[in-house]
Amino acid sequence: MESERTVGGRRSPTVVTGPLADYAAGFRQFLIAQGYARRTITVQVSLMAHLSRWLQAEGLTVDALRSSADIDRFFAERRARGHSSAVSANALVALLGFLRDRQVIGGPAADAGTPARRLLADYRRYLREERGSAAATVRGFSACAAMFLRVLPAERLEEALAAISAADVTRFVAGWAASRSPAYSKSMVSALRSVLRFLHSCGYIPRPLASAVPAVPGWRVAGRPRAVTGREVTAILAACDRGSARGRRDYAILMLLTRLGLRAGEVAGIGLSDIDWRQGLLMVRGKGNSLDGLPVPVDVGEAVADYIRHGRPRCKSRVLFVSVRAPFAGLSAASIGSAVRRACEAAGLDGFGPHRLRHAVACQLLREGASLNEIGQLLRQRDPRTTARYAIVDAGALAGLARPWPQGAER
């Protein structure tokens, strides 16, 4: 197996020859910047050297790396030569990502040029440039668009789009929402309306069908979620191993969720420059690209500072919360949810998601005498009905609002 060579008792870096030679130094620096361990960097550069020699022997250029068939042929030969590590296409994720970022190669050849792919790329560009949508919105709406296009025949996509009717839209929503929660389905229909408006404006569909998307009922009073108690909040905070990097990170995440009532996506989107330590303010990017400054309680600030000093890896990413292992990428909203569920498991509790902690903040404020209007302002909610829904989970507070039965009504 290729590795660092030993020359005069000392190790020297693997020399890359062939079509990839010009990119070897940059790739090595890329891996270092991403925080990969020295041994991993050695393996990755050795793999690059082997791949480059193989390309040269086969008379292929770097552009051949867009072909999954050529990549499979390389790994088949690598396994046949007795290699036991880095023997599948997953081992090339870092190298291919590096080459694509630098526009040395394009996307996979099998995916390029299909009508659906081109349409999705145009839709993402529309959301970013014309609508000014946040990154999370672009991802979510694009996923909905992909699911919608997937039910249409790929070989005659434009013809199928032109023939879509309001009844087709209704059937799609009904079939998709049947196995999803009302909350998730409601977000999906919002995305679908956006997709249909885009398709109509671009001439793919002749009629405006956004209004044909049916509404999804969202109120489920009989099945109202159980409120997370203060004792449970204390338990999940205590369950974090604050002696480890992951524990410090998860503790800081939980403090932001339980003290400020942030959404998972808002926590994931916090950057290092969003914290004003002198003023004690945190800039939060919310729904609709809103930007709000929230005062940071002392205990929350201490948790975040402890993570930055002793738990956050040194890396180029400017996102506050990053993965604990290389490559050090910013956490997604789903990763924030995983941190909550991990703490629940460690505390011996039934798992719940980050939004339940937002409910808990609202309920606690309600118990302390805050009005629904004040709670809505703190949680940055535009619709008072949304805030009222949080109050449903606190039966005790609602009971306190009930007027006593008139004594004169007794018989």
Regions found by a protein language model. Name each.
Residues 1-411:
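Conserved catalytic core of the tyrosine transesterase superfamily
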